[in-house]
Amino acid sequence: MRLRGCGPRAAPASSAGASDARLLAPPGRNPFVHELRLSALQKAQVALMTLTLFPVRLLVAAAMMLLAWPLALVASLGSAEKEPEQPPALWRKVVDFLLKAIMRTMWFAGGFHRVAVKGRQALPTEAAILTLAPHSSYFDAIPVTMTMSSIVMKAESRDIPIWGTLIQYIRPVFVSRSDQDSRRKTVEEIKRRAQSNGKWPQIMIFPEGTCTNRTCLITFKPGAFIPGAPVQPVVLRYPNKLDTITWTWQGPGALEILWLTLCQFHNQVEIEFLPVYSPSEEEKRNPALYASNVRRVMAEALGVSVTDYTFEDCQLALAEGQLRLPADTCLLEFARLVRGLGLKPEKLEKDLDRYSERARMKGGEKIGIAEFAASLEVPVSDLLEDMFSLFDESGSGEVDLRECVVALSVVCRPARTLDTIQLAFKMYGAQEDGSVGEGDLSCILKTALGVAELTVTDLFRAIDQEEKGKITFADFHRFAEMYPAFAEEYLYPDQTHFESCAETSPAPIPNGFCADFSPENSDAGRKPVRKKLD
């Protein structure tokens, strides 16, 4: 598989009109990956700061948290559901001022000496909801502490010592995983607050639902837009030359990010409040359209592209299996196109055997775009042509249907590596014994990983102990059982772009601190993906 540049249908954010139904092509970089490379001088600076300023900054930040805790504790006593009094009591204003000052001191101690603010924050009566993007780090809490706005948080967050008390002070909206109706109740609560005519604090929401590397804006979750109330878009920038801020699924862990950031002399952050966006009647009826149009406005302000990658694509990259998807895999793009064509993974998984039998009957015979569309039972379209081009590496106008079936298998069941390999062996294997040669194994694994180049010679020789020049799935399965980490040793031992993004931490926590509450994302059967702590 090969991703040709940014795709034939790439477009800047400004051209993505409200009624534009095309899916924009993805950016050149995977938004869920962040590589941090320090020069020799930067490493020397980190070493010096680690021994000098870092411990001081850490102690001051911790002291500020401890100082804020009793104030927040006293101020948050009572029912959080009770409507705030209007106008706020004098003591509440004093506590607000003190907490903002303490939090600002904490960020100052961390190197955020100046927070540049552009534009004007809307009044609660003008916009009850603030949508922030791009969401790239836990340092995105800076605008929350500066404004003392409410946020949407997991219910479990209230039990975190000190931090949980500070959170409760800002009257957050909690989402409970144990309550099946929690997401619906959350949307109703946001709608209730939005219609309170400014009686409740504004709610800050990160509609991307996860952290990215700020190279683009991924699909916005519709939860913040379901109430149909006006929102104020807020864009965040961290213009430091060395980006120690970004906390993505693949890259430095949370503790490493904290350490490197506190070892910088100065950390820059910019917060820009854009004009309030009032939805049209059509947008009120269609939250996805509302979210898309707000995202377009924010992308234009940031000067970045938009992509229809979603948090679910990140879950695909993080699925636990014996083959780890590389950072530059084409399968994220393939999964996006599958969604765009309206193909449901649940239905595709049931039809995989039928697809594979159809591909096996072709026996490697190449097919054109029309037959490709007929095989997937979808009409020819721009999206299908984009998918077709992923497999048409030579530009001949023909592809091998078997490769598409392998890619579909990975997207439908990303954690079941051996099931995908077994399906591939059925399609590629010789009729008499189901064996494949080195060339076919290379094609299978390249497609399963979504890469254009891959050397499998060492792996093939290790499996083919008898030097028959061919292997069966039984041989492959036996080898995989004996050497579960065969991919790291034989396929990409020295290739840094294959670095795993699915490391397990002893105390895993979600990526980002703003919980998702979109109703359509409530699959209770799927195990939630966790971000590595370090």
Curated annotation (Swiss-Prot):
Membrane-crossing residue ranges in chain numbering: 58-78
A GO CC annotation given for this chain: plasma membrane
Q: Where in the cell is it found?
A: Endoplasmic reticulum membrane; Golgi apparatus membrane; Cell membrane; Lipid droplet
Q: How does it sit in the membrane?
A: Single-pass type II membrane protein
Q: Which residues lie on this side of the membrane: Cytoplasmic?
A: 1-57
State the encoding gene. LPCAT1
Q: What is this protein called?
A: Lysophosphatidylcholine acyltransferase 1
Q: Where is the EF-hand domain?
A: 379-414, 451-486
Biased segments, Basic and acidic residues type: 523-534
Q: Where is this region: Disordered?
A: 1-22, 512-534
Tell me the organism: Homo sapiens
Explain the purpose of this protein: Exhibits acyltransferase activity. Exhibits acetyltransferase activity. Activity is calcium-independent. Catalyzes the conversion of lysophosphatidylcholine (1-acyl-sn-glycero-3-phosphocholine or LPC) into phosphatidylcholine (1,2-diacyl-sn-glycero-3-phosphocholine or PC). Catalyzes the conversion 1-acyl-sn-glycerol-3-phosphate (lysophosphatidic acid or LPA) into 1,2-diacyl-sn-glycerol-3-phosphate (phosphatidic acid or PA) by incorporating an acyl moiety at the sn-2 position of the glycerol backbone.
Q: What does the free-text pH dependence field read?
A: Optimum pH is 5.5 and 7.5.
Q: What does the entry list as the binding residues for Ca(2+)? A: D392, S394, S396, E398, E403
Q: Where is the composition biased (Low complexity)?
A: 7-22
Superkingdom, according to UniProt?
Eukaryota
Asked if Kinase is a keyword of the record, the answer is no
**Family membership:** Belongs to the 1-acyl-sn-glycerol-3-phosphate acyltransferase family.
Going by the UniProt record, its keywords in alphabetical order are: Acyltransferase, Calcium, Cell membrane, Endoplasmic reticulum, Golgi apparatus, Lipid biosynthesis, Lipid droplet, Lipid metabolism, Membrane, Metal-binding, Phospholipid biosynthesis, Phospholipid metabolism, Repeat, Signal-anchor, Transferase, Transmembrane, Transmembrane helix
Q: Which CDD domains match?
A: LPLAT_LPCAT1-like
